[in-house]
Amino acid sequence: MALSRPVRLFSLVARLILAPRRGLTVRSPDEPLPVVRIPVALQRQLEQRQSRQRNLPRPVLARPGRLLVSARRPEFNQPARLTLGRWESAPLASQGWKSRRARRDHFSIERAQQEAPAVQKLSSEGNFADLGLEPRVLHALQEVAPEVVQPTTVQSNTIPQLLRGRHVLCAAETGSGKTLSYLLPLFQRLMVQPSLDSLRIPAPRGLVLVPSRELAQQVQAVAQPLGRSLGLLVRDLEGGHGMCRIRMQLARQPSADVLVATPGALWKALKSRLISLEQLSFLVLDEADTLLDESFLELVDCILEKSHIADGPADLEDRFNPKAQLVLVGATFPEGVGQLLDKVASPDAVTTITSSNLHCIMPHVKQTFLRLKGADKVAELVHILKHHNRAERTGPSGTVLVFCNSSSTVNWLGYILDDHKIQHLRLQGQMPALMRAGIFQSFQKSSRDILLCTDIASRGLDSTGVELVVNYDFPPTLQDYIHRAGRVGRVGSEVPGTVISFVTHPWDVSLVQKIELAARRRRSLPGLVSSVKEPLPQQPDFDKSD
């Protein structure tokens, strides 16, 4: 009995070992056993990833053709013949760029056309004479700029409205000829209107308000030859030099018929009673979207209060009681313009002119986006600049603009380029006025091919010789991106334009995704104002004691 229990246990174990197992087949002695080289869990993950990639929608091309969007991963390419609907979703090449694994990824928005959309294809009979300009103004234009033969779309729409005496708000893409669209009517208005007896202080009849000294110098360089040909004197008034310099500028005789000024310098002169706006008959806010920003809005409001803005075209007919015609010009539609116009003029007296490509990605400029780590940006920039200098070109070569978001980054990056023996110029807002003077003019004359700058060089400045724009720091807003990208591909440019943007931060990726989606849909960038909004009526203040 003592041995029966171990014998019974041994027989049970033997029975379990010798019992057939489920799921196993009998193998021959010569058949090799299966070898597991990849863990089963990892193998399942790979199979799931491959199935997701197979299920991604891919654009089907009937035959090869040009691309609208070309990406490093071909499944995100979009042919030029395909346009996504407004509500149609699409996989974006930048969809996963907020992940660190997306570093070194890139995509490009290719050129859809060669010619700038601002150039209007007129018939051989279309010219400036058809717009209502007088022969004297046409002769001056032909003498000063013989290459300007046909008006652009913006000029064809803006000049007739200004000649009718309407207040005009013109918002059109960069490089579309907006400067001439207001200068020619301005000079014609001053030629028709007699000059009144001058006061004891200068009293210009035309005023062009601009946000920066560089833009003031550029507008003066365009307006001065035209004015000289018509017997009108054009001068500028720049800030940053102190009151002594402002007094010297305004003390020159004879006083200017047209004054190009920055808001700060003009307001100092008005407070000191060195200048009067009582005889003003034409007021232009160039780059109005910038002038109506918080940094300038208070000064602009004070200047407009000193100006006598006409209520309508009828007020402009009194030659001995001049009132000013108001013109607002910008590459993006200025926010807050409704509140501004409500203070100085009737909204019904303002004609709004916008181009069909307002706030759109420029179709004739290639735009590339690189997802980079912050530490890799310097090496990538140096590579781009050295490759640009060594590039073999059959046609004319252009210059390079490198944009940074702060003055300190411009200075630091300049030291890096000095170490690499890359010659360049620097332009940023914290420079003293004497140091800033003439830097952009030197760049325009190609004394240096590379300019490191902040957004001070992104507004309005003529850059027909620029071939490449590099956003070392991605712009903080879509408006800033439009202005920076607008430095290339301008009317009159002899070189094709390209924009390269370094994308580093998650908030940069959010803006890039909006740009990519707008390009795939061929629509304007989202969230930008495109019409004048009337201000909301103010609520009456109720006394709490009632």
UniProtKB/Swiss-Prot annotation:
EC number: 3.6.4.13
GO cellular component: mitochondrial nucleoid; mitosome; nucleus; ribonucleoprotein granule
Nuclear localization signal (motif): residue ranges: 520-523
A GO MF label: rRNA binding
Pfam family membership, one: Helicase_C
Disulfide bonds: none
Residue window of motif DEAD: 286-289
Mitochondrion found in the keyword field: yes
Motif Nuclear export signal, residue range(s) on this chain: 180-191
Broad class of enzyme this protein falls into: hydrolase
Name assigned to this protein: Probable ATP-dependent RNA helicase DDX28
